[in-house]
Structure formats: structure tokens, C-alpha cells
Amino acid sequence: MLKYILYIERALKSKLSYVVADRYGVSEEAIDDGSGLISSYLDRKNYSNSHNLRDTTLRSITEVLDYSKDAEHTIGNKKFYISSSLRHYATRHNHIPPWILVTSLSFGVTTQWYSILRSADKTRIANSFIRDPQLTEDEKKEYLKTSIDLIRRYRNTLAHGGKTTDIFIGRIPKKQCIQLSNGLLCRDDFTGDNITQSGVQTVISILLSLINDQYMENALIQDVINLFWLYRSRDTDSFGKGIWDDLGLSGEFMNGLLQVYSAPSI
């Protein structure tokens, strides 16, 4: 599922950088264009400090910018990944637009950047991901923030060889998760012992709710089902138990994927 998490990471970066550029311009530094001073899109006044994250987040972003502009990388003790596009802009242009900057930001820093946006900016991004008219704007924003945090932690768990069944989903907004799961999840999945068992299923549902691309949705479903099919019961046509129980995937959930999304048969 890593490639689908990467797809959503790139989508978040694209949507965030578009909103920031549209609202606050394309220069990372305040510049005078001859007709007046143009402020930076990283100006503190453009962001909310409701969770006391503004200064630390902007500092993290600025560290990447400074590193990209320092040819000898002598600034500070940290090392950062600098994309070829950011390196090009840092050395050949007089500004670095946000859609270039995000190519070198980690998923974590990008998520923090989203978290310090003003409410109206978050709403634009949340609405572009989630189009369900039955959810309020606040519910969409809450779901997007917690969902992005969860799949980021899930990716980090996979990358470090951790147990995917340890994913903590207790804080995921249940109403939105159930509403956007197309019937794949219900309230029982978020009660008692089912909370741990439903972790991977919740991750899959979140990915499907945020991808917003039919081809990618079908590809994700097909990948999950193909892998699950390797462990089906040998004497029936149903999805079997065993390793997939340990992963928190049920036959009911997998059959739901086939029925709800009409995935190609295998």
C-alpha cells in the first residue's frame, strides 16, 4: 500500500502548494518588485498558531530552503533531501514557489504545514479531497487531518519493520470514517477489541476515500485482493483465515471490497 500512500502524499503537497500560492504568492522571501513590497508566503501572519506549531513548522520549512541555497551545505548540522527541481530554482531563480518547495519536504513536515494553515485554507484543501455533502466542513477538516496522520504513521511503521496491527485508530473520527467507507466499516469496528483488528481495514478505507481516482482505486483494491487471495481457504472459494486475521483483515471486509467497488474478478 506504500505507493497509494505516496499518491495521497503527492496529492496533499499539490493541493497545499496551490492554495498557498493562490493566497499568499509564490515567493519564499519578501521582495520589492519595484511597485511595492511583496510579502513571503511563509510570513507568520499567514498562518494560525492555535496549536503552538506555527514557529516550529515554519522553522522546519526554512531549514530546507536554507540548505537548498547553500551550495556547500555548511549551514547547521542537519542534512536534507533536496530535489533536482528545488536545487534548480535555488541556484537559477530569484524565488522558490511553494509547489517546488514541497518536492523536498517530508510527509511529516507537509502535514505540519497543513495543520498551521488558516481555517479557510484548510477548508479548500479538505473540500478538494472529500466531496461528501453529508459532512460539514469542520467534519471534513477533522477527518483529513487525522487520516493523513494515521496513514503517515502506518507508512513509517512499514518502513521500520513494525507491526501493522499496532496502528492506533482510537482517535479517528468514527462518523466520517464510516460515512466515507461505502459500507465497508460500521460502528462495531470501532468498539472493544475490534479497534485493533480494524486498523489495516481502516487504513484501506481511508486510502480509498482520499484517492479520488477511479483507476487508482481499482488498482488498490486489486492489489489488496490479489495478495489476500494467496491465503484463501484451499477447500472453499471464500477468503481464508490465518495470517490475514493477524493483519486485521476479515473475509467480510474483503468481500465488501468486491461488492461495493465492483473490482475486477480474480
Enumerate the language-model features and the residues they cover.
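Long, contiguous internal "core" modules enriched in hydrophobic/ aromatic residues
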Residues: M1-S265
